[in-house]
Amino acid sequence: MALPWVEKYRPKSFADVVDQEEAKYVLASWICARFRAPKDFCTRWAKKKDKEILDARAVLLAGPPGVGKTTLIHALAREIGYELIELNASDVRTAERLKEVVGRGLREGSLFGYGGKIVLFDEVDGLHVKEDAGGLEAIIEIIENSKVPIVMTANNPYDPRFRPLRDISLVVNLKRLSEEEVVEVLRRICTSEGAKCEEEALRSIAKSSLGDLRAAINDLQMYLSGGRKTLTVDDIKRVGERNPQLSMFEILDRVYRARWFDEARAISFNPSFDWEQYFIWATETIPVVYKEIETMSVAYDRLSKADMFIGRIKRTQEWELLPYALELALGGVSQIKSKPRLPPFIKYGFPQRLLILAKSREARKRRDVLVEYLAQNLHVSRSYVKSEIIYVLGVLAKSDSKIVERLSKALGINAIDIKTLL
Ligand SMILES: Nc1ncnc2c1ncn2[C@@H]1O[C@H](COP(=O)(O)OP(=O)(O)OP(=O)(O)O)[C@@H](O)[C@H]1O
């Protein structure tokens, strides 16, 4: 399998990490003030003198997904020649295990002549404070006693549960990448892959990535998969049209993985977002993603409330209510208190409802013709035909086959089909 481009083009040095200059200055100033680091690096990057930065015991990089938090730490370790001890909070479920792993990492000598060690707790907000017995306290204890740099990353460290961690660390916010920067990185990748990519096409990918460079690079790789060497705006449109289920998979994935309410809600601004389709897909994918009955029930409750808004909108045409419905259906389904940690890959199936509807499309068309014919000739509404007449005709047709024949002649639909419709 080809190397994912997010790995292939992961920045190796501090300078290669784009659009995060402020964070780089803060991080470098902290490292250079408190630990041993190469002079060249410090001269170039350690530009901050604030006491708060120089005195910090640990650094917590906060920001949305795919903006370079983890990459920045990897680049830092490489720049200063330190060995990186990387721990994912969810891998380390208990205080004992956490201390053991960090302790072992710090005790063992480095084989490759590193200048020191740096500990990275990736995604600390993935810690379930209740379940991960003592995990948070253990991290704080490690920070308090550590002689090596400790850095953490989090999408959302502003949950009150993480207050103690924020208090003891310097929180450095990384921003969403600008559209310009995303386009620039995509352009460079196109050149290096020998592909001709239209500026407009890259801009369109950048726009829908919402500042998440990882998502943008993944999209570009998908568009250029199979060795394709050109990318035009039309290609992007065509892929969207030909594979609506593909973009719906992406939409669902973004909704379920969104860390913040706003992030989930923003998906409705995406040009490919079709809320009617989304409702169908969400209905069938909630139990695929949320296995626990409680979480599942909260998600369904919110989706059903959104559906009540939709029902009202359809009845009264009060379209100004749509944003409320979408907030419930996107933010509400995505942000659930007991939300579990999601696996890296979720297999969202194609909704059965759509498959059944597609299979029965012809039969439904014939049924509509029949209903329309009866409604017009009997001077009644279509819903009356559906709820009453069809049933009565069905019973009559069983005892008198002429009824079916006459309907068949009048409608030009063969008699067997009429029988199955009644
Ligand atoms: N600022 C950046 N400069 C250059 N490349 C970046 C930047 N941000 C992200 N990338 C690209 O996106 C990929 C993912 O970035 P990274 O893992 O650092 O994101 P993250 O912010 O840690 O996200 P998450 O919170 O989901 O872990 C990188 O491998 C890199 O290719």
Swiss-Prot record:
ATP binds at G63, P64, P65, G66, V67, G68, K69, T70. CDD domains: AAA, HLD_clamp_RFC. GO terms for biological process: DNA replication. InterPro entries: AAA+_ATPase (IPR003593), ATPase_AAA_core (IPR003959), P-loop_NTPase (IPR027417), Rep_factor-C_lsu (IPR023935), RFC_lid (IPR047854). The keyword Transcription does not apply. Gene3D superfamilies: 1.10.8.60, P-loop containing nucleotide triphosphate hydrolases. Keywords: ATP-binding, DNA replication, Nucleotide-binding. Disulfide bonds: none annotated. Heteromultimer composed of small subunits (RfcS) and large subunits (RfcL). PANTHER family: CHROMOSOME TRANSMISSION FIDELITY FACTOR 18, REPLICATION FACTOR C SUBUNIT 1. Belongs to the activator 1 small subunits family. RfcL subfamily. This is Replication factor C large subunit.
